[in-house]
Amino acid sequence: MGEISQEAVERYLEKNPCFAKEYFDKKLRVEALGVIFKNSHAGVQTGLSLPEMTQVEESAVCLELLQCMQDEAGSAEQMAHRALQRLAQLLQADCCSMFSCRARNGIPEVASRLLNVTPTSKFEDNLVAPDREVVFPLDIGIVGWVAHVKKALNVSDVKKNSHFSDFMDKQTGYVTRNLLAVPIVAGKEVLAVVMAVNKISAPEFSKQDEEVFSKYLSFVAVALRLQHTSYLYSVESRRSQILMWSANKVFEELTDVERQFHKALYTIRTYLNCDRYSIGLLDMTKEKEFYDEWPIKLGEVEPYKGPKTPDGREIIFYKIIDYILHGKEEINVIPSPPADHWTLVSGLPTYVAENGFICNMLNAPADEYFTFQKGPVDETGWVIKNVLSLPIVNKKEDIVGVATFYNRKDGKPFDEHDEHITETLTQFLGWSLLNTDTYERVNKLESRKDIAQEMVMNLTKATPDEISSILKFKEKLNVEVIEECEERQLLAILKEDLPDPRTADLYEFCFSDFPITEHELVKCGLRLFLEINVVEKFKVPVEVLTRWMYTVRKGYRPVTYHNWRHGFNVGQTMFTLLMTGRLKKYYTDLEAFAMLAAAFCHDIDHRGTNNLYQMKSTSPLARLHGTSILERHHLEYSKTLLQDESLNIFQNLNKRQFETVIHLFEVAIIATDLALYFKKRTMFQKIVDTCEQMQSEEETIKYVTSDPTKKEVIMAMMMTACDLSAITKPWEVQSQVALLVANEFWEQGDLERTVLQQQPIPMMDRSKKDELPKLQVGFIDFVCTFVYKEFSRFHGEITPMLNGLQNNRVEWKSLAEEYEAKVKVTEEEAGKQEEEASDGKAATDLGGSAEDKKSKTCLML
């Protein structure tokens, strides 16, 4: 058989189409498509037409495109490039291009990514470098329009299309006649626009071309969506890492804004995806000092005419922190940066500080508005390319600084996702300033408190003259300053001048302070400490003890009842319960020392009003302490005195002993809140019941002292018994004290009526003062009787207090009955008068005058 020519084969195939179909169904898939799709550099005969290609099964083409996706899984651009090569061949287009869609500064735009892809072009030649991108908004060109409407567009003659722009043609010298553009969409977001340009074998792209283009671009869409999803995952991962680490570092540093920013920004540097970033911190001064304004007002200095922040501050960057991430990591801090520093010379940070805008700039050195440095900014040779600048705004919406990020690491410009990440960061940093501001305010308040405390202490602390009025060292030792005296000499002098405890009835439950001056009461208080033998045992400096005692006296305000006399009486009763009542056997000397001192301080700085009034008037004390308001204030005042070494009577105790004293102060003073009395009295009653059944004193002591809680419950009830002890005094004393208490209550009632505009309760209503005996009887029955009855059961030595209480109840009951009798007589007389008045009215109605009996409506003639 002779050699068959090519022409003969073509003629045979044309005359036998059925044979040709069978042959190509078997052979073309492997031989022809293998050359077309697998070898990007293989030449394909240009005469191969679409009808000829569509004779091949479409599944084979899909398989080849999937193989391309698998081979180029690492780069969506490379996969898209290979697909565009094949589409250019299939559609018989002169070339294909792909434009990516993004947004900057809130404005969507398209940018060239792959340009002029042909069946034989190389990827490197078609890929557009980030610094050579052609970028234009969506209102320019057909590509922008397709991205805007998100629909494919087949333009047969571009000159007749109103959306066509010849911008690209002028740039490249290319002539566009017709084109087919299709958007690639993920949800509602356009990722890219792919375009086929200039149909070769026809004047325009056909409907069949549109179908093929859209069909096979779905593979490109899958690759781009995968890449976009991966990018979004990276964005969210970076955002969460930035927030987590910045929060971690922000709360590590609360004292200084600069250190707070630096710790946060340095820690998150790896997640910012840029070569370099800088933070400019703004001066927060809103008003100049008066002496800084003098030169301006006198004309010696020109007034500031530069830009200002939205809140009116002069834009002055007092510090720049420059973070270098390219090459060797480095941090530069530039205090008081000059205006020509490369971070400021462009004017962008100033513009952002003035307007509060986010500025995302592509190819920043070419910008005409801002003057960025076009060459290297420093000796590293680093050059500015892309810039993203944002304001740092605090919770008050004041701009406190400007953060500027330079050159995204992948070379691309910063996009909207970078804007969101950095905006999240700057917002968090701005809001975190609330921590440092709060810390600063707290520090200032603490300083003001310390100053106020010092001022108050200066007024209340016993002066040297007041101390010498009790410790007469000048007269006795003939020295001018107390520091020249020895401790034993001062103690001897003090013992000589203090009153005799028996003569002053300090051991008696019936003690009365009325015959004694307030100054002498200070001496009596000092005597009580000497009587319990704690001064020498715990090495209490005599001068310190005297100063503390006198200062406690001055700490009590001159109110009607809760004054120094009441404070002393409570201290004296505590002493009497311990010594005369023999409760001291349950407590150590240190505990007795603390209990006596706490009793003297229990109402220090009382305002003459109760806790309820503090809450009603929303006083600072009520805002500071939620419960037991005044008691907690008395406790804090007492602890404040002990913080001053010259007043700390416990200064020679060890740490553990001092902690014990403070705890006992807390228990004792808070226990004087009567609101807590009803909670503790059941516990106390159980202790008394148990002790009453004990066979010996030793057994009782062991039972009580073995449990610190029992000792605290007893101590708390002792404080209540001391606080209410005026109700147990002899009648001539108790009746006067009751009037003092009542007067203080009435004064509070007057305040409630005038200041708070509220009606006081009967106990504090001055208009119901005649009901005082009845109220006293109720108070004795409801509150007091239990306390002294149980203490009498607990220790028989305390029975005199119960007897005094019962005697006073008889007196108050008698007065209450007298008052009730008077009220009854008054009511009876008022009733009789009403009856007489009503009887007289009835008689008048029945036996009226003749004139009254005449009818006013009918006249008899």
UniProtKB/Swiss-Prot annotation:
Span of domain GAF: 75-224, 256-433
Compositional bias (Basic and acidic residues):
826-839
Assigned GO CC terms: plasma membrane
What EC number(s) is this enzyme filed under? 3.1.4.35
> Which Gene Ontology terms cover its molecular function?
3',5'-cyclic-GMP phosphodiesterase activity; cGMP binding; metal ion binding
Kindly give the membrane topology term recorded for this protein.
Lipid-anchor
Ligand binding (a divalent metal cation 1) = H566, H602, D603, D723
* Amino acids binding 3',5'-cyclic GMP: S97, N116, D169, K170, Q171, T172, T176
Residues bearing the modification Cysteine methyl ester: C858
Ranges where the PDEase domain occurs = 486-819
Active site (UniProt): H562
Q: Which cofactor does it need?
A: a divalent metal cation
Q: Does the keyword Nucleotide-binding apply?
A: yes
Q: What keywords appear on the UniProt entry? A: Cell membrane, cGMP, cGMP-binding, Hydrolase, Lipoprotein, Membrane, Metal-binding, Methylation, Nucleotide-binding, Prenylation, Repeat, Sensory transduction, Vision
Prodomain positions? 859-861
- What's its top-level EC category? hydrolase
Co-factor note (free text): Binds 2 divalent metal cations per subunit. Site 1 may preferentially bind zinc ions, while site 2 has a preference for magnesium and/or manganese ions.
**Subunit notes for this chain?**
Composed of two alpha' subunits that are associated with 3 smaller proteins of 11, 13, and 15 kDa.
Q: Which family does it belong to?
A: Belongs to the cyclic nucleotide phosphodiesterase family.
Provide the function of this protein: As cone-specific cGMP phosphodiesterase, it plays an essential role in light detection and cone phototransduction by rapidly decreasing intracellular levels of cGMP.
Q: What is this protein called?
A: Cone cGMP-specific 3',5'-cyclic phosphodiesterase subunit alpha'
* Source organism of this protein record: Mus musculus
